[in-house]
């Protein structure tokens, strides 16, 4: 039998199974697909998704390099805290210049070390506002803002970077912690956390709220990691980040941590764990971080203890001294709004965690029925439930209530939600819950599209065209979530919910940020005053809102006097007054010449030039 010669295959570069897909290209995409499906590749993809969304929600419209600094400092707290950090930095630079030193000594000689110590202490101990001590809050925010000022210059957006960077650290560390201890729902939890209304809002504020919530939450996760593993290493998180939170807002941080841990261990009857939590190296680390500043500021300001601990902690909780009274149910409303658009899912996850915890507690207090845990991690829902609920319940009894007080409750609720979504992936999300989540997302879309109509144009009834577009887009967002949830399952719910949120943030800041700036910040007013009077004249005010006064003080870097408090300056100056109060000028400026420079109609203000007293 004669062998039949087989055809010789052509060279590989000429033979392709799919002419439209060359082998090299197919090989690249096949390798990429295998990589993304591997544990390492999926981790890289998840982390990239997290960084992209976190960077967008925390920084877009905040920095000049990313959407522009769209909104100036708003409210009274933001410009006040930003100005304190600026004055502390100026005092610090002056003191360092006087001793010809930096924080890092030039050498190990005693004189250089002493000079560096004087430089370190100069301007960093006592918070100062308009040259006087301001002792309402500890110094962590001011220190961090000083660092960003030195790096990027003094600006409103650099004053907000301490909160944005603290939030980013919280999101990343929470993601890594959950990936290590609760894999599966870690990406959902992190994305829910970074996109909730409360986190997005406070992460963009030049305030102390996120300086407390972020390290406090990281420390609590560290404590539970120690509880589950028994490794002392994790207790460093509790004490280190607990100290940072104490330097941010004072004794409320260790108080909340102690109460939550005490409740958790008490309900589990594990009192020995409470004793083991008191770890000497951790306690020493905490004291080494906290005591130097508290001792130093008390020595330099003998009234600090009374003003800070008593007035701004005890009296603030026990009374309505600072006029922040709200009804008892106030934080229920704040929670509903702060968790948007994830409110329905978060409340369902909280109820699920609460049901699990109650069942555990009932079984635990019935010894004959209690057979123990299947795994050590079963206690995590109990811990998260107590962590989420205690600040809400505790501050509901406070005489003063502000939204930021319950910010530490948002991270555990986001974690509960992410874990809940992971656990129901196989069974699927109940239709009523999917529909409710879609309605909440559609409602958020509808309301935020109408926001410029209410906030900028002050329209009770919005323009019909805008109302129609808001309704259509709100319904479209809801239907999109319902379709994806039913067709592709729970796994894709997180990303499809992010689509309208991403567009809404661009709409609010990218398209309407300048309008919000004109109506709610003093920055445009300060710019207009600077253009009209480039000589840097003194500015005074009469019957102007506190946020405008503090805002002008920051943007002009000068104290803004008040006619009703400090009197009328004798020198030439600029006066800012509500337009409807202009008839008071004759009373305050008898015999003085003055003329109107311009009207700032968006905030109902008039600006006058007042000539020197003759």
Which residue stretches match the model-derived regions?
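Membrane-embedded architecture of ER/inner-membrane glycosylation machinery
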Residues: 3-6, 14-15, 22-43, 236, ...
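Membrane-integral, polyisoprenol-dependent glycosyltransferases
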Residues: 2-431, 451, 602-604
């Amino acid at each position: 039998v004669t062998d039949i010669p087989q055809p010789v295959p052509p060279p590989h570069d000429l033979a392709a199974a799919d002419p439209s897909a060359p082998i090299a290209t197919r090989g690249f995409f096949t390798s990429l697909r295998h990589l993304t499906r591997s544990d390492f590749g999926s981790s890289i993809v998840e982390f990239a998704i997290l960084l992209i969304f976190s960077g967008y929600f925390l920084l877009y419209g905040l920095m000049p390099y990313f959407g522009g600094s769209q909104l100036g400092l708003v409210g009274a707290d933001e410009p006040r805290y930003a100005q304190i950090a600026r004055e502390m930095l100026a005092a610090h630079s002056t003191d360092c210049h006087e001793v010809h030193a930096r924080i890092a000594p030039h050498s190990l000689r005693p004189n250089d070390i002493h000079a560096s110590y004087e430089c370190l202490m100069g301007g960093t101990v006592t918070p100062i506002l308009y040259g006087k001590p301001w002792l309402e809050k500890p110094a962590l925010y001011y220190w961090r803002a000083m660092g960003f000022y030195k790096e990027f210059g003094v600006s409103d957006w650099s004053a907000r970077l301490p909160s944005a960077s603290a939030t980013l650290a919280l999101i990343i560390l929470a993601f890594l912690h959950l990936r290590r201890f609760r894999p599966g729902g870690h990406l959902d939890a992190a994305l829910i956390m970074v996109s909730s209304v409360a986190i997005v809002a406070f992460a963009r504020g030049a305030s102390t709220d996120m300086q407390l919530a972020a390290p406090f939450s990281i420390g609590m996760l560290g404590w539970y990691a120690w509880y589950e593993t028994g490794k002392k290493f994790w207790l460093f998180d509790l004490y280190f980040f607990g100290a940072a939170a104490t330097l941010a807002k004072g004794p409320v941080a260790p108080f909340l941590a102690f109460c939550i841990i005490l409740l958790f261990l008490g309900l589990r009857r594990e009192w020995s764990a409470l004793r083991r939590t008191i770890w000497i190296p951790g306690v020493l680390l905490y004291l080494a971080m906290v005591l130097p500043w508290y001792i130093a500021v008390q020595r330099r300001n003998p009234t600090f203890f009374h003003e800070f601990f008593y007035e701004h902690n005890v009296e603030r909780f026990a009374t309505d001294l600072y006029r922040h009274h709200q009804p008892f149910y106030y934080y229920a409303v704040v929670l509903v709004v702060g968790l948007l658009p994830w409110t329905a899912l978060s409340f369902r996850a909280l109820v699920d965690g609460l049901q699990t915890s109650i069942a555990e507690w009932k079984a635990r207090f019935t010894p004959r029925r209690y057979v123990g845990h299947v795994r050590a991690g079963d206690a995590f829902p109990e811990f998260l439930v107590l962590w989420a609920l205690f600040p809400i319940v505790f501050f509901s009894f406070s005489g003063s209530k502000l939204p930021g007080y319950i910010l530490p409750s948002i991270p555990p609720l986001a974690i509960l939600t992410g874990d809940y979504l992971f656990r129901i992936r196989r069974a699927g999300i109940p239709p009523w819950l999917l529909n409710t989540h879609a309605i909440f997302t559609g409602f958020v879309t509808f309301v935020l599209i109408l926001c410029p109509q209410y906030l900028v144009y002050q329209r009770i009834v919005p323009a019909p065209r805008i109302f129609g577009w808001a309704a259509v887009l709100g319904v479209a967002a809801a239907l999109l979530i319902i379709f994806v949830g039913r067709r592709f399952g729970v796994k894709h719910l997180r990303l499809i919910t992010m689509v309208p949120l991403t567009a809404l943030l661009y709409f609010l800041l990218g398209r309407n940020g300048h309008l919000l700036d004109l109506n709610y910040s003093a920055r445009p007013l300060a710019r207009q005053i600077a253009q009209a009077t480039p000589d840097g004249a003194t500015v005074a005010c009469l019957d102007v809102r506190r946020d405008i006064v503090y805002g002008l003080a920051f943007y002009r870097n000068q104290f803004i006097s008040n006619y009703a408090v400090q009197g009328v300056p004798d020198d030439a100056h600029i006066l800012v007054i509500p337009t409807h109060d202009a008839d008071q000028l004759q009373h305050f400026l008898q015999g003085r010449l003055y003329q109107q420079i311009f009207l700032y109609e968006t905030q109902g203000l008039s600006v006058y030039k007042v000539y020197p007293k003759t």
